[in-house]
Amino acid sequence: AAGCPVVVKPSEYTPLTALALARLADGLLPPGVLNVVPASRQNAQPVGEVLCDSSHIKALSFTGSTAVGKWLYARCASTVKKLGLELGGNAPMVVLKSADLDIAVKAAMASKFRYGGQTCVCADRFLVHEAVVDNFVEKLAAEASALKLGHGLDAGTGIGPLIDEAATFKCQERVKGAISQGATVVCGGNKPPGPGSFFEPTVVRDVAIDSEL
């Protein structure tokens, strides 16, 4: 309801965003209405336990992984909180035989490479009709290869870095795993030389249904 005080526990990877919003709200809201509690990765669970166990907190909203969502669901049971959970998925983009491939590729690029593929609404996989898969892959790879890696404020940059080096390593390992199961890298697939947690825009086809990629 409007006017209820809020406690925000931002992601340990991006705490400054929530703190910036709190600074903008400073002086506009009464003291104690908007409260930001950053926490390191090591302290995220203890902070979560306090929020879940408190009888003063009546509702909890969370966006993140399914594993953490299940933990919060169970932890909030003792205080019977209202819960709003937006959890991980594996949503496909489906390309039918009758699809306009130029439109399909444009949609695929907008979905998959938005914020470096790090948003919760990105398509996680592409299911393409066998009659058009070759043309679709060719067009998609051409668009992906044209993306320029670099600083987000530099002119011409099409895609920036991943959140950290661990994410880059994870991408490398997932691509290697897919190759070992018979997949083919059409473009990208590597960390480029130089500093930063960059990873080449990558298109992989014929990925096994049980692949971690």
Per-region residue spans from a language model:
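Short, small-residue-enriched loops and turns at beta-alpha junctions
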Residues: 14-15, 41-42, 193
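ALDH superfamily catalytic-core signature
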Residues: 24, 28-29, 59, 65-212
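Phosphate- and divalent-cation-binding pockets in alpha/beta enzyme and binding domains
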Residues: 16-20, 46, 71, 135-136
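Cofactor-binding loop segments of dinucleotide-utilizing enzymes, especially the Rossmann-like FAD-
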Residues: 9-11, 39, 97
